Amino acid sequence: MPPKSLSNLSQTAGVNQSGFFPGASERDFLPATDRTTAEFVIRCVIPSLYLLIITVGLLGNIVLVKIFLTNSAMRSVPNIFISNLAAGDVLLLLTCVPVDASRYFLDEWMFGKVGCKLIPVIQLTSVGVSVFTLTALSADRYRAIVNPMDIQTSGAVLWTCVKAGGIWVVSVLLAVPEAVFSEVARIDGLDNGSFTACIPYPQTDELHPKIHSVLIFLVYFLIPLGIISVYYYHIAKTLIKSAHNLPGEYNEHTKKQMETRKRLAKIVLVFVGCFVFCWFPNHILYMYRSFNYNEIDPSLGHMIVTLVARVLSFCNSCVNPFALYLLSESFRKHFNNQLCCGRKSYRERSPSYLLSSSAVRMTSLKSNAKNIVTNSVVPNGHSVKQEMAL
Protein backbone atom coordinates (compact mmCIF):
# COMPACT_ATOMS: atom_id res chain seq x y z
CA MET A 1 0.00 0.00 0.00
CA PRO A 2 1.30 3.49 -0.79
CA PRO A 3 2.23 5.45 2.33
CA LYS A 4 -0.23 8.22 1.49
CA SER A 5 -3.18 5.88 1.46
CA LEU A 6 -1.97 4.24 4.62
CA SER A 7 -1.79 7.57 6.38
CA ASN A 8 -5.31 8.42 5.33
CA LEU A 9 -6.72 5.14 6.49
CA SER A 10 -4.98 5.04 9.84
CA GLN A 11 -5.82 8.55 10.95
CA THR A 12 -8.14 8.85 13.88
CA ALA A 13 -11.88 9.28 13.50
CA GLY A 14 -11.62 12.42 15.48
CA VAL A 15 -10.66 15.92 14.78
CA ASN A 16 -10.78 15.93 11.01
CA GLN A 17 -14.36 14.76 11.41
CA SER A 18 -14.01 12.92 8.13
CA GLY A 19 -11.97 10.12 9.57
CA PHE A 20 -14.66 7.47 9.64
CA PHE A 21 -13.15 4.54 7.81
CA PRO A 22 -15.32 1.45 8.39
CA GLY A 23 -13.68 -0.19 5.39
CA ALA A 24 -10.25 -0.07 6.91
CA SER A 25 -8.93 -0.72 10.37
CA GLU A 26 -5.60 -0.15 12.07
CA ARG A 27 -5.32 -3.90 12.46
CA ASP A 28 -4.82 -4.17 8.68
CA PHE A 29 -1.50 -2.35 9.02
CA LEU A 30 -0.07 -4.22 12.01
CA PRO A 31 2.74 -6.76 11.83
CA ALA A 32 1.48 -10.34 11.96
CA THR A 33 2.97 -10.85 15.43
CA ASP A 34 0.77 -8.08 16.85
CA ARG A 35 -2.47 -9.04 15.15
CA THR A 36 -3.63 -11.55 17.76
CA THR A 37 -3.64 -8.89 20.46
CA ALA A 38 -5.16 -6.39 18.07
CA GLU A 39 -7.96 -8.77 17.12
CA PHE A 40 -8.86 -9.25 20.79
CA VAL A 41 -8.95 -5.51 21.43
CA ILE A 42 -10.92 -4.78 18.28
CA ARG A 43 -13.41 -7.64 18.51
CA CYS A 44 -14.11 -7.49 22.25
CA VAL A 45 -13.00 -4.35 24.04
CA ILE A 46 -13.72 -1.58 21.52
CA PRO A 47 -17.27 -2.67 20.52
CA SER A 48 -18.17 -3.00 24.21
CA LEU A 49 -16.93 0.53 24.88
CA TYR A 50 -18.88 1.88 21.91
CA LEU A 51 -22.06 0.17 23.06
CA LEU A 52 -21.58 1.60 26.55
CA ILE A 53 -20.99 5.10 25.16
CA ILE A 54 -24.12 4.95 22.98
CA THR A 55 -26.35 3.58 25.75
CA VAL A 56 -25.18 5.90 28.50
CA GLY A 57 -24.99 8.92 26.22
CA LEU A 58 -28.48 8.52 24.79
CA LEU A 59 -29.99 7.88 28.22
CA GLY A 60 -28.35 10.88 29.84
CA ASN A 61 -28.88 13.40 27.05
CA ILE A 62 -32.47 12.42 26.24
CA VAL A 63 -33.47 12.57 29.90
CA LEU A 64 -31.70 15.93 30.22
CA VAL A 65 -33.63 17.42 27.30
CA LYS A 66 -36.89 15.93 28.58
CA ILE A 67 -36.39 17.50 32.02
CA PHE A 68 -35.85 20.94 30.52
CA LEU A 69 -38.81 20.61 28.14
CA THR A 70 -41.29 19.38 30.74
CA ASN A 71 -40.33 21.80 33.53
CA SER A 72 -41.20 25.38 32.66
CA ALA A 73 -39.23 26.66 35.66
CA MET A 74 -36.08 25.36 34.01
CA ARG A 75 -36.47 27.15 30.69
CA SER A 76 -33.73 29.65 31.39
CA VAL A 77 -30.98 30.96 29.15
CA PRO A 78 -28.20 28.59 30.31
CA ASN A 79 -30.54 25.59 30.25
CA ILE A 80 -31.45 26.28 26.63
CA PHE A 81 -27.78 26.21 25.72
CA ILE A 82 -27.25 23.01 27.71
CA SER A 83 -30.19 21.42 25.86
CA ASN A 84 -28.52 22.49 22.63
CA LEU A 85 -25.38 20.66 23.69
CA ALA A 86 -27.41 17.54 24.44
CA ALA A 87 -29.19 17.65 21.06
CA GLY A 88 -25.86 17.77 19.24
CA ASP A 89 -24.56 14.86 21.29
CA VAL A 90 -27.65 12.77 20.55
CA LEU A 91 -27.16 13.36 16.82
CA LEU A 92 -23.57 12.17 17.04
CA LEU A 93 -24.44 9.11 19.12
CA LEU A 94 -27.21 8.00 16.75
CA THR A 95 -25.24 8.36 13.53
CA CYS A 96 -21.46 8.66 13.73
CA VAL A 97 -20.71 6.31 16.61
CA PRO A 98 -22.55 3.28 15.12
CA VAL A 99 -20.94 3.91 11.73
CA ASP A 100 -17.51 4.12 13.31
CA ALA A 101 -18.17 0.94 15.29
CA SER A 102 -18.95 -0.92 12.07
CA ARG A 103 -15.38 -0.38 10.87
CA TYR A 104 -14.24 -3.14 13.23
CA PHE A 105 -16.47 -5.77 11.61
CA LEU A 106 -16.75 -4.76 7.95
CA ASP A 107 -13.96 -4.99 5.39
CA GLU A 108 -15.65 -2.58 2.98
CA TRP A 109 -17.31 0.81 3.16
CA MET A 110 -21.00 -0.15 3.20
CA PHE A 111 -22.68 3.25 3.28
CA GLY A 112 -22.11 4.38 -0.29
CA LYS A 113 -21.16 7.76 -1.67
CA VAL A 114 -24.03 9.50 0.12
CA GLY A 115 -22.91 8.12 3.48
CA CYS A 116 -19.33 9.15 2.76
CA LYS A 117 -20.50 12.71 2.15
CA LEU A 118 -23.06 12.88 4.95
CA ILE A 119 -21.35 11.23 7.93
CA PRO A 120 -18.37 13.64 8.07
CA VAL A 121 -20.75 16.61 7.88
CA ILE A 122 -22.83 15.27 10.77
CA GLN A 123 -19.80 14.74 12.99
CA LEU A 124 -18.27 18.13 12.29
CA THR A 125 -21.67 19.75 12.83
CA SER A 126 -21.99 18.05 16.21
CA VAL A 127 -18.53 19.18 17.28
CA GLY A 128 -19.30 22.71 16.08
CA VAL A 129 -22.53 22.78 18.07
CA SER A 130 -20.63 21.66 21.17
CA VAL A 131 -17.76 24.13 21.06
CA PHE A 132 -19.81 27.12 19.87
CA THR A 133 -22.50 26.45 22.47
CA LEU A 134 -19.86 26.26 25.20
CA THR A 135 -18.57 29.62 24.02
CA ALA A 136 -22.09 31.07 24.13
CA LEU A 137 -22.59 29.61 27.62
CA SER A 138 -19.40 31.26 28.81
CA ALA A 139 -20.57 34.57 27.36
CA ASP A 140 -23.90 34.17 29.18
CA ARG A 141 -22.15 33.53 32.51
CA TYR A 142 -19.93 36.55 31.85
CA ARG A 143 -22.95 38.81 31.34
CA ALA A 144 -24.76 37.39 34.37
CA ILE A 145 -21.83 38.03 36.71
CA VAL A 146 -20.08 41.06 35.24
CA ASN A 147 -23.34 42.83 34.31
CA PRO A 148 -25.69 41.81 37.15
CA MET A 149 -28.24 44.53 36.30
CA ASP A 150 -29.07 42.69 33.07
CA ILE A 151 -31.98 40.62 34.42
CA GLN A 152 -33.41 37.75 32.39
CA THR A 153 -36.77 38.40 30.73
CA SER A 154 -39.10 36.29 28.62
CA GLY A 155 -37.61 38.00 25.59
CA ALA A 156 -34.15 36.83 26.62
CA VAL A 157 -35.31 33.21 26.51
CA LEU A 158 -36.72 33.66 23.00
CA TRP A 159 -33.56 35.40 21.84
CA THR A 160 -31.48 32.55 23.27
CA CYS A 161 -33.52 30.06 21.22
CA VAL A 162 -32.69 32.11 18.13
CA LYS A 163 -28.99 32.02 19.07
CA ALA A 164 -29.14 28.25 19.55
CA GLY A 165 -30.67 27.86 16.09
CA GLY A 166 -28.00 30.14 14.67
CA ILE A 167 -25.30 27.92 16.18
CA TRP A 168 -26.72 24.96 14.26
CA VAL A 169 -26.85 26.92 11.00
CA VAL A 170 -23.25 28.10 11.35
CA SER A 171 -22.07 24.60 12.32
CA VAL A 172 -23.72 23.03 9.26
CA LEU A 173 -22.33 25.67 6.90
CA LEU A 174 -18.80 25.20 8.24
CA ALA A 175 -19.15 21.42 7.80
CA VAL A 176 -20.30 21.55 4.15
CA PRO A 177 -16.73 21.45 2.73
CA GLU A 178 -16.37 18.00 4.30
CA ALA A 179 -19.01 16.71 1.89
CA VAL A 180 -17.27 18.39 -1.03
CA PHE A 181 -13.89 16.70 -0.56
CA SER A 182 -14.82 13.32 0.99
CA GLU A 183 -14.90 10.45 -1.49
CA VAL A 184 -15.06 6.67 -1.68
CA ALA A 185 -11.80 5.21 -2.98
CA ARG A 186 -10.35 1.79 -3.70
CA ILE A 187 -7.28 1.18 -1.53
CA ASP A 188 -4.58 -1.46 -2.02
CA GLY A 189 -3.98 -3.50 1.15
CA LEU A 190 -0.79 -4.94 2.61
CA ASP A 191 -1.65 -8.52 1.61
CA ASN A 192 -2.01 -7.83 -2.12
CA GLY A 193 -5.71 -7.23 -1.61
CA SER A 194 -7.82 -4.11 -1.83
CA PHE A 195 -10.85 -2.58 -0.15
CA THR A 196 -13.08 0.48 -0.42
CA ALA A 197 -12.85 3.25 2.15
CA CYS A 198 -14.24 6.73 2.69
CA ILE A 199 -11.34 9.18 2.66
CA PRO A 200 -11.56 12.88 3.63
CA TYR A 201 -9.58 14.30 0.70
CA PRO A 202 -7.92 13.18 -2.56
CA GLN A 203 -5.15 10.65 -1.98
CA THR A 204 -2.63 12.54 -4.12
CA ASP A 205 -3.07 15.87 -2.34
CA GLU A 206 -0.41 16.33 0.37
CA LEU A 207 -1.13 20.00 1.12
CA HIS A 208 -4.84 19.56 1.84
CA PRO A 209 -4.43 17.52 5.08
CA LYS A 210 -2.01 20.08 6.51
CA ILE A 211 -4.35 23.00 5.82
CA HIS A 212 -7.35 21.01 6.99
CA SER A 213 -5.81 19.96 10.31
CA VAL A 214 -4.63 23.48 11.16
CA LEU A 215 -8.00 25.07 10.31
CA ILE A 216 -9.89 22.45 12.32
CA PHE A 217 -7.61 23.00 15.31
CA LEU A 218 -8.04 26.78 15.14
CA VAL A 219 -11.78 27.00 14.44
CA TYR A 220 -12.99 24.13 16.60
CA PHE A 221 -10.53 24.26 19.47
CA LEU A 222 -7.94 26.99 19.93
CA ILE A 223 -9.95 30.12 19.06
CA PRO A 224 -13.09 29.14 21.05
CA LEU A 225 -10.92 28.09 23.98
CA GLY A 226 -9.15 31.45 23.87
CA ILE A 227 -12.47 33.31 23.90
CA ILE A 228 -13.74 31.19 26.79
CA SER A 229 -10.52 31.84 28.72
CA VAL A 230 -10.98 35.61 28.34
CA TYR A 231 -14.56 35.38 29.61
CA TYR A 232 -13.54 33.34 32.64
CA TYR A 233 -10.65 35.64 33.42
CA HIS A 234 -13.09 38.55 33.71
CA ILE A 235 -15.58 36.39 35.63
CA ALA A 236 -12.92 35.47 38.19
CA LYS A 237 -11.74 39.06 38.49
CA THR A 238 -15.31 40.30 39.04
CA LEU A 239 -16.07 37.66 41.67
CA ILE A 240 -12.89 38.45 43.60
CA LYS A 241 -13.52 42.19 43.42
CA SER A 242 -17.20 41.97 44.40
CA ALA A 243 -16.36 39.77 47.40
CA HIS A 244 -14.44 42.71 48.90
CA ASN A 245 -16.96 45.43 48.04
CA LEU A 246 -20.31 44.20 49.36
CA PRO A 247 -22.44 46.41 51.66
CA GLY A 248 -22.55 44.92 55.13
CA GLU A 249 -26.33 45.12 55.51
CA TYR A 250 -26.84 43.04 52.38
CA ASN A 251 -24.01 40.63 52.97
CA GLU A 252 -26.03 37.49 53.72
CA HIS A 253 -28.42 37.83 50.81
CA THR A 254 -25.71 38.80 48.35
CA LYS A 255 -23.49 35.98 49.54
CA LYS A 256 -26.16 33.45 48.54
CA GLN A 257 -26.58 35.14 45.19
CA MET A 258 -22.86 35.07 44.58
CA GLU A 259 -22.66 31.40 45.52
CA THR A 260 -25.38 30.59 42.99
CA ARG A 261 -23.59 32.46 40.25
CA LYS A 262 -20.26 30.83 41.07
CA ARG A 263 -21.93 27.42 40.98
CA LEU A 264 -23.36 28.08 37.53
CA ALA A 265 -20.01 29.32 36.25
CA LYS A 266 -18.35 26.23 37.71
CA ILE A 267 -20.74 23.91 35.84
CA VAL A 268 -19.98 25.59 32.52
CA LEU A 269 -16.25 25.45 33.27
CA VAL A 270 -16.51 21.70 33.93
CA PHE A 271 -18.25 21.27 30.56
CA VAL A 272 -15.39 23.14 28.88
CA GLY A 273 -12.81 21.05 30.72
CA CYS A 274 -14.47 17.82 29.59
CA PHE A 275 -14.49 19.02 25.99
CA VAL A 276 -10.79 19.92 26.10
CA PHE A 277 -9.83 16.62 27.74
CA CYS A 278 -11.82 14.52 25.26
CA TRP A 279 -10.91 16.30 22.03
CA PHE A 280 -7.35 17.56 22.55
CA PRO A 281 -5.69 14.15 21.90
CA ASN A 282 -7.51 13.86 18.57
CA HIS A 283 -6.44 17.32 17.48
CA ILE A 284 -2.80 16.61 18.27
CA LEU A 285 -2.86 13.17 16.66
CA TYR A 286 -4.53 14.44 13.49
CA MET A 287 -2.05 17.30 13.05
CA TYR A 288 0.87 14.94 13.68
CA ARG A 289 -0.35 12.61 10.96
CA SER A 290 -1.15 15.44 8.58
CA PHE A 291 2.37 16.82 8.81
CA ASN A 292 3.92 13.35 8.52
CA TYR A 293 1.79 12.42 5.55
CA ASN A 294 4.29 10.06 3.92
CA GLU A 295 5.09 8.11 7.07
CA ILE A 296 3.16 5.50 9.01
CA ASP A 297 3.71 3.81 12.34
CA PRO A 298 2.33 0.25 12.11
CA SER A 299 3.08 -0.63 15.74
CA LEU A 300 0.53 -1.93 18.22
CA GLY A 301 1.24 1.03 20.50
CA HIS A 302 0.30 3.50 17.79
CA MET A 303 -2.92 1.63 17.13
CA ILE A 304 -3.83 1.75 20.82
CA VAL A 305 -3.15 5.49 21.01
CA THR A 306 -5.38 6.00 17.98
CA LEU A 307 -8.21 3.94 19.46
CA VAL A 308 -7.98 5.72 22.82
CA ALA A 309 -8.17 9.10 21.10
CA ARG A 310 -11.16 7.93 19.07
CA VAL A 311 -13.03 6.60 22.10
CA LEU A 312 -12.27 9.74 24.12
CA SER A 313 -13.75 11.97 21.43
CA PHE A 314 -17.01 10.03 21.52
CA CYS A 315 -17.03 10.00 25.33
CA ASN A 316 -17.48 13.76 25.22
CA SER A 317 -21.02 13.13 23.96
CA CYS A 318 -22.07 11.41 27.18
CA VAL A 319 -20.19 13.17 29.99
CA ASN A 320 -22.20 16.40 30.29
CA PRO A 321 -25.28 14.80 31.91
CA PHE A 322 -22.98 13.12 34.43
CA ALA A 323 -21.27 16.40 35.24
CA LEU A 324 -24.64 18.08 35.72
CA TYR A 325 -25.84 15.17 37.85
CA LEU A 326 -22.85 15.53 40.18
CA LEU A 327 -22.88 19.34 40.40
CA SER A 328 -26.60 20.13 40.50
CA GLU A 329 -28.73 18.71 43.30
CA SER A 330 -31.92 19.85 41.60
CA PHE A 331 -31.06 18.16 38.30
CA ARG A 332 -30.04 15.04 40.19
CA LYS A 333 -33.47 14.85 41.86
CA HIS A 334 -35.28 15.45 38.57
CA PHE A 335 -33.14 12.85 36.83
CA ASN A 336 -33.81 10.24 39.51
CA ASN A 337 -37.50 11.03 39.30
CA GLN A 338 -37.50 10.49 35.52
CA LEU A 339 -36.00 7.04 36.01
CA CYS A 340 -38.63 6.05 38.57
CA CYS A 341 -41.82 5.24 36.66
CA GLY A 342 -45.18 5.69 38.33
CA ARG A 343 -44.22 8.65 40.50
CA LYS A 344 -45.69 12.09 40.28
CA SER A 345 -43.74 14.69 38.40
CA TYR A 346 -41.05 16.13 40.63
CA ARG A 347 -42.01 19.62 39.64
CA GLU A 348 -45.41 19.09 41.30
CA ARG A 349 -43.91 17.92 44.58
CA SER A 350 -40.92 20.04 45.48
CA PRO A 351 -39.19 23.36 45.00
CA SER A 352 -36.89 23.35 42.03
CA TYR A 353 -34.45 25.41 40.13
CA LEU A 354 -31.51 24.25 38.11
CA LEU A 355 -29.74 26.99 36.26
CA SER A 356 -31.14 30.49 36.22
CA SER A 357 -29.26 33.44 34.83
CA SER A 358 -30.77 35.95 37.22
CA ALA A 359 -34.40 35.38 38.17
CA VAL A 360 -35.15 32.86 40.92
CA ARG A 361 -37.99 30.50 40.09
CA MET A 362 -39.75 28.42 42.74
CA THR A 363 -42.73 26.07 42.70
CA SER A 364 -45.15 25.70 45.61
CA LEU A 365 -46.29 22.46 47.17
CA LYS A 366 -49.84 23.42 47.98
CA SER A 367 -50.84 26.46 45.96
CA ASN A 368 -50.99 27.58 42.39
CA ALA A 369 -48.20 29.76 41.09
CA LYS A 370 -48.60 33.48 41.39
CA ASN A 371 -46.15 36.26 40.70
CA ILE A 372 -44.83 38.80 43.15
CA VAL A 373 -42.12 41.38 42.76
CA THR A 374 -39.40 41.68 45.37
CA ASN A 375 -36.30 43.75 45.77
CA SER A 376 -32.92 42.01 45.71
CA VAL A 377 -29.36 43.20 45.86
CA VAL A 378 -26.78 42.37 43.23
CA PRO A 379 -23.05 42.08 43.89
CA ASN A 380 -22.34 45.73 43.13
CA GLY A 381 -24.68 46.81 45.93
CA HIS A 382 -27.53 48.09 43.73
CA SER A 383 -31.11 47.14 44.45
CA VAL A 384 -33.01 45.65 41.53
CA LYS A 385 -36.42 44.14 41.05
CA GLN A 386 -36.56 40.43 40.66
CA GLU A 387 -39.59 38.30 39.82
CA MET A 388 -40.30 35.16 41.80
CA ALA A 389 -42.95 32.56 40.96
CA LEU A 390 -44.41 31.23 44.20
Swiss-Prot record:
Instruction: List glycan-bearing residues.
Output: N8, N16, N192
Q: What does this protein do?
A: Receptor for neuromedin-B. Contributes to the maintenance of basal sigh rate through signaling in the pre-Botzinger complex, a cluster of several thousand neurons in the ventrolateral medulla responsible for inspiration during respiratory activity. Contributes to the induction of sneezing following exposure to chemical irritants or allergens which causes release of NMB by nasal sensory neurons and activation of NMBR-expressing neurons in the sneeze-evoking region of the brainstem. These in turn activate neurons of the caudal ventral respiratory group, giving rise to the sneezing response.
Q: Tell me if Membrane is a UniProt keyword of this record.
A: yes
Concerning its family, UniProt says: Belongs to the G-protein coupled receptor 1 family.
Which pairs of Cys residues are joined through disulfide bonds in the record? C116-C198
Q: How does it sit in the membrane?
A: Multi-pass membrane protein
Where found? Cell membrane
Q: Which UniProt keywords apply?
A: Cell membrane, Disulfide bond, G-protein coupled receptor, Glycoprotein, Lipoprotein, Membrane, Palmitate, Phosphoprotein, Receptor, Transducer, Transmembrane, Transmembrane helix
Q: In which tissues is it expressed?
A: Highly expressed in peripheral tissues where it is detected in the respiratory system, circulatory system, digestive system, urogenital system, lymphatic organs and endocrine system (at protein level). In the testis, expressed mainly in Leydig cells (at protein level).
Could you list the residue ranges that cross the membrane? 45-65, 77-97, 118-138, 156-176, 211-231, 267-287, 306-328
Quick one: where's the S-palmitoyl cysteine lipidation?
A: C341
The source's superkingdom equals Eukaryota
- Topological domains on the Extracellular side lie at 1-44, 98-117, 177-210, 288-305
Q: Which residues carry this modification: Phosphoserine?
A: S352
Q: Which GO cellular component terms, listed alphabetically, does the Swiss-Prot or TrEMBL entry include? A: plasma membrane
What is the name of this protein?
Answer: Neuromedin-B receptor
The answer, when asked if Phosphoprotein is one of the entry's keywords, is yes
* Molecular function terms, GO-annotated: bombesin receptor activity; neuropeptide receptor activity
**A Pfam family name for this chain?**
7tm_1
User: What is the protein's major site of localization?
Assistant: membrane
The cross-references to InterPro entries, in alphabetical order and at most eight, read: Bombsn_rcpt-like, GPCR_Rhodpsn, GPCR_Rhodpsn_7TM, NeuroB_rcpt
Cytoplasmic side of the membrane: what ranges?
66-76, 139-155, 232-266, 329-390
The UniProt entry's GO biological process terms, in alphabetical order, are: antiviral innate immune response; G protein-coupled receptor signaling pathway; negative regulation of interleukin-6 production; positive regulation of osteoclast proliferation; sneeze reflex
